[in-house]
UniProtKB/Swiss-Prot annotation:
It is found in: Cytoplasm. InterPro entries: ExoRNase_PH_dom1, ExoRNase_PH_dom2, ExoRNase_PH_dom2_sf, KH_dom, KH_dom_type_1, KH_dom_type_1_sf, NA-bd_OB-fold, PNPase. One of its GO terms (molecular function) is RNA binding. This is Polyribonucleotide nucleotidyltransferase. It comes from Anoxybacillus flavithermus (strain DSM 21510 / WK1).
């Protein structure tokens, strides 16, 4: 039966937002076509009919970029889209995080949300359209989603907040905030900012929430008209009798195991307790389902005890106070041949960051759905399995590693010197060597140290800290510097990075349905206190960037030429510039305004390359005398090289004061002679005279 097409419209930040339902992808549980300006995104939500036998909620969110959306054909031999770009992976995570908490506890049906970007208007964010579409597709479907949610981008231009700023406005904005939530509360924040005070960030979040409420009302109105009845699902539940039996048996032992201060010893104590209880039920010949439930009940008891300790006794598993940071240590200059290195350790979390400086030609070229651009600052994050004492495959970066690397990049970018101040490409790599929570924030601290060790003149040091939350009813406890167990068993992971002056990055994920303004405000202020403490420690390790770069870092020499001369330096098909590079071993980057960056480890070679370029662009002046070298002899005269790339002709009649029969009677190839420029004709040919120089010398002697 043909389904009726429904169209709904609203204004969103001064641009039309139109939703079409019932025409496309009708076999999905829910499907919507979102048109935002000229951006078009198809969002679908699909669920399995039966629950999966797993101990987690199997949700997958995909943000699919199609290059036809911006009128491009993919590069390479295959000519089709390959692996998702970093931007697509980050967008998938951005959509996943606010919708994941809004499914019932025990829901185990597989859910897949796919957003296909089909057309892109650069001023109408496809990510925000996809987030809206994903929520609406779930809301109108028969999947038991407890939304809707919505998300907006907030910028601040000239002190005023702007919803979904255009590309031009974003260039002027001192923050880039993505906030998502339900109509009652915020449940996801992702932000980069130029050292913005905590109070301003909070106001921006709440400003965004007002727009979110309007978008949710729009979704609820659509769902009331075209939404399907929600499917009946069986929620996974623990056996109450078995739970009571195990609770009575091991409650005291769980309390003791949870309070073992050291991570590995605590994990070993919990594992031993689990093994003993499972063994006891195996002896009773319990079936597989019962043994699975035994393990899940023990996990639940551990979670309850950790949360009880924090909320009731204000005691954490490792014995710290709720606002106490783990012991800190740091060092710089660990790797002699690298350009800069920094080690940062916080409790059992440790990150080693390495800074590498390159020429401007080493920038990363970004060619996706956005405007083509380059990136001269990169921050990469690696999380090897040995960091948690496990074995595992060493593959390329996963979604989590890409997300953590991007968060560090966002946190550090506001303090990176401009290209004019520091004409280098900067790459940071953070290797997580030990992990017990907050590794992304440790990598930010280690990367700050590595840049200072490398001599990068950053505007201010940046530190990061992760805040946690345990909420029970109306009572809540905010934790400073959460460790792995608190992250895993708590309700919030709120990462805050910044300088002494203000915030440079925020990232908030929660497992509950939302957070109030009061909790956000308290978490931001508690994070500031912790951040300042960490910055103070880092400044004791290295108080300012080193004045000298590493001897192994490239030296960069900058020069300015007339932009009209750029083609002379490059030469036909790059022949001239390649000759200079071959002769000197340097890298040469030329800007459109005539700025040239020459880089190599050898300063003498930089100077040599500069001299060659100066000679190429040097202008020959009429009336000037030059010491040139005879390069070629013809019957009618001699061709003399004045300097690299500039020749002129001394006609036979201009070689001497007396009559010359043969050119070879006066000069030979290789001779150095003084010549005067007498004329530059319309074709740019240079005429020289040796006779004029001889005459001038005679007159001077008289």
């Amino acid at each position: 039966m043909e389904q009726e097409k429904h169209v709904f419209s609203i204004d969103w930040a001064g641009r039309p937002l139109t939703v079409e339902i019932g025409e496309l992808a009708k076999q999905a549980n829910g499907a919507v076509l979102v048109r935002y300006g000229d951006t078009v995104v198809l969002s679908t939500a699909t669920a399995s009919k039966e629950p999966k036998s797993v101990d987690f909620f199997p949700l997958t969110v995909n943000y699919e970029e199609r290059l036809y959306a911006v009128g491009k054909i993919p590069g390479g031999f295959i000519k089709r889209e390959g692996r998702p770009s970093e931007k697509a992976i980050l967008a998938s995570r951005l959509i996943d995080r606010p919708i994941r908490p809004l499914f019932a506890e025990g829901f185990r049906n597989e859910v897949q949300v796919v957003s296909m970007v089909m057309s892109v208007d650069q001023d109408c964010s496809p990510e925000m359209a996809a987030m809206f579409g994903s929520s609406l597709a779930l809301t109108i479907s028969d999947i038991p989603f407890e939304g809707p949610i919505a998300g907006v981008t907030v910028g601040r231009v000239d002190g005023k907040f702007v919803i979904n700023p255009s590309v031009a406005q974003m260039e002027q904005s001192d923050m880039h905030l993505v906030v998502a939530g339900t109509k009652d509360a915020i449940n996801m924040v992702e932000a980069g900012a130029n050292e913005v005070p905590e109070e301003v960030m909070l106001e921006a979040i709440m400003f965004g929430h007002e727009e979110i409420k309007r978008l949710i009302a729009f979704q609820e109105d659509i769902a009331a008209k075209v939404g399907k009845e929600k499917m009946e699902v069986v929620l996974y539940e623990l056996n109450a009798e078995l739970e009571a039996e195990i609770r009575a048996r091991v409650e005291g032992e769980v309390k003791r195991a949870v309070q073992v201060p050291e991570k590995l010893a605590r994990e070993a104590a919990i594992e031993q307790l689990k093994a003993e209880v499972v063994a006891a039920y195996e002896e009773q010949e319990a079936d597989e389902e019962t043994l699975k439930q035994v393990k899940e009940i023990l996990y639940k008891l551990v979670k309850e005890e950790v949360r009880r300790l924090i909320t009731e006794e204000k005691v954490r598993p490792d014995g710290r106070k709720v606002d106490e940071i783990r012991p800190l240590s740091s060092a710089v200059g660990l790797l002699p041949r690298t350009h800069g290195s920094g080690l940062f350790t916080r409790g059992q979390t440790q990150a080693l960051s390495v800074c590498t400086l390159g020429a401007l030609g080493d920038v990363q070229i970004l060619d996706g759905l956005g405007i083509e651009e380059t990136k001269r600052f990169m921050h990469h994050y690696n999380f090897p399995p040995f960091s948690v004492g496990e074995t595992g495959a060493m593959r390329g970066p996963g979604r989590r590693e890409i997300g953590h690397g991007a968060l560090g990049e966002r946190a550090l970018e506001p303090v990176i010197p401009s290209e004019k101040e520091f004409p280098y490409t900067i790459r940071l790599v953070s290797e997580v060597l030990e992990s017990n929570g907050s590794t992304s924030q440790a990598s930010i601290c280690a990367s700050t140290l590595a840049m200072m060790d490398a001599g990068v003149p950053i505007k201010a040091p940046v530190a990061g800290i992760a805040m946690g939350l345990v909420k029970s009813g109306e009572h809540y406890t905010i934790l400073t510097d959460i460790q792995g167990m608190e992250d895993h068993l708590g309700d919030m992971d709120f990462k805050v990075a910044g300088t002494e002056k203000g915030v440079t990055a925020l990232q908030m994920d929660i497992k509950i349905k939302g957070l109030s303004r009061e909790i956000l405000e308290e978490a931001l202020q508690q994070a500031r206190k912790g951040r300042l403490e960490i910055l103070k420690h880092m400044m004791q390790t290295i108080s300012e960037p080193r004045k000298e770069l590493s001897p192994y870092a490239p030296k960069i020499l900058t020069m300015q030429i007339n932009p009209d001369k750029i083609r002379d330096v490059i030469g036909p098909s790059g022949k001239q510039i390649n000759k200079i590079i071959e002769e000197t071993g340097v890298k040469i980057d030329i800007e459109q305004d005539g700025t040239i960056f020459i880089s190599s480890v050898n300063e003498e070679m930089n100077k040599k390359a500069k001299k060659i370029i100066e000679d190429i662009v040097r202008e020959v002046e009429v009336g000037q005398v030059y010491l040139g070298k005879v390069k070629r002899i013809e019957k009618f005269g001699a061709f003399v090289e004045l300097f690299s790339g500039k020749d002129g002709l001394v006609h036979i009649s201009e070689l001497a004061e007396e009559r010359v029969g043969k050119v070879e009677d006066v000069v030979s190839i290789g001779d150095e002679i003084l010549v005067k420029v007498t004329e530059i004709d319309k074709q740019g040919r240079v005429n020289l005279s040796r006779k004029a120089v001889l005459r001038d010398q005679k007159e001077a002697e008289q």
